[in-house]
A protein has these predicted regions:
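Non-catalytic alpha/beta scaffold blocks inside enzyme catalytic domains
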Residues: 1-151, 209, 213-264
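Long, low-complexity segments enriched in small/aliphatic residues
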Residues: 138-229
Length: 264
């Protein structure tokens, strides 16, 4: 598989996996990670340790953000590219059920380009020899290089309505249920996970541990839903404290409080 990608792309793939997002931030602050192309993700809003994330974004020599909103990450961008919403996209969508379905745009992108077209233009500006003309060609390349997608075509998706990978020459119409008899390596492998305690500790100065949670009216960090009428259902964030902890600190329901931690 690696050789297929190297032949198709004309490059030598690194033998080791690349950095994960937290490692990117650490490397950026130490000077070893200088540029990031952030597409459809508001890492300044959603990732933990905000000060650390913002310092990393500020330290980069080139930060390109592509999104449908001028989000928190965009405030640090050197270049901002407009993204396209689901109503403006043409292509496929693969969900957590492994189901590949067609997506058809209802309107032209207000920013003038679909996401893939903006990515294509950036790649060409950087000297890449990319010549895709439509999303179907991109899916054809995925099918040519990814064994579990080898049998996926737009024609098949249109004919069947959707396809679940793996979809190969052997399983030409997809795989509704995987691992019916066994796993690829045989029987299931159970692993004992070693307990790793949290680094946070209650101290005399910081006697409570705080964690973030979810609210019904907002999806995840609310990158999209906070820009809708959903915000009228939950106009401001609240801090929830155990009644005993609140009483011992003289805090009543509805009071304003200040919050401080070891990192800010």
């Amino acid at each position: 598989v690696r050789e297929s990608f190297e032949d198709a792309w004309g490059v030598k793939l690194d033998a080791e996996p690349g950095h994960r997002i937290p490692n990117m931030f650490d490397e950026a602050l130490s000077g070893g990670f200088k540029g990031l192309y952030c597409q459809g993700e508001d890492i300044a809003q959603s990732d933990p340790n905000t000060r650390h994330v913002e310092a990393a974004l500020e330290s980069m020599e080139c930060l390109i953000v592509q999104d449908i909103f001028l989000n928190e990450t965009a405030k640090f961008a050197h270049v901002f590219l407009p993204g396209s919403s689901f109503l403006e996209k043409d292509g496929t969508f693969t969900n957590a059920e492994r189901r590949i379905s067609r997506v058809r745009k209802a309107m032209e992108p207000l920013g003038g380009k679909a996401d893939w077209e903006a990515t294509l233009g950036l790649a060409q500006a950087l000297g890449c020899d990319w010549d895709y003309e439509n999303p179907e060609q991109i899916m054809a390349e995925i099918a040519a290089l990814t064994p579990s997608f080898a049998g996926v075509t737009y024609e098949k998706i249109e004919r069947l309505g959707s396809v679940q990978w793996p979809c190969t020459d052997v399983v030409s119409e997809g795989t509704p249920t995987m691992h019916e008899d066994s796993f690829t390596r045989g029987l299931g492998q159970f692993v004992v996970t070693e307990y790793v305690p949290t680094v946070e500790r209650c101290t005399r100065r910081f006697p409570l541990i705080m964690t973030t949670g979810r609210i019904l009216s907002q999806y995840n960090v609310g990158a999209q839903t906070r820009r809708t009428e959903n915000s009228t259902w939950h106009a401001e964030d609240v801090l929830e404290i155990h009644p005993a902890d609140a009483e011992s600190r003289g805090i009543s329901d509805g009071d304003w409080v200040g919050i401080a931690s070891r990192i800010g």
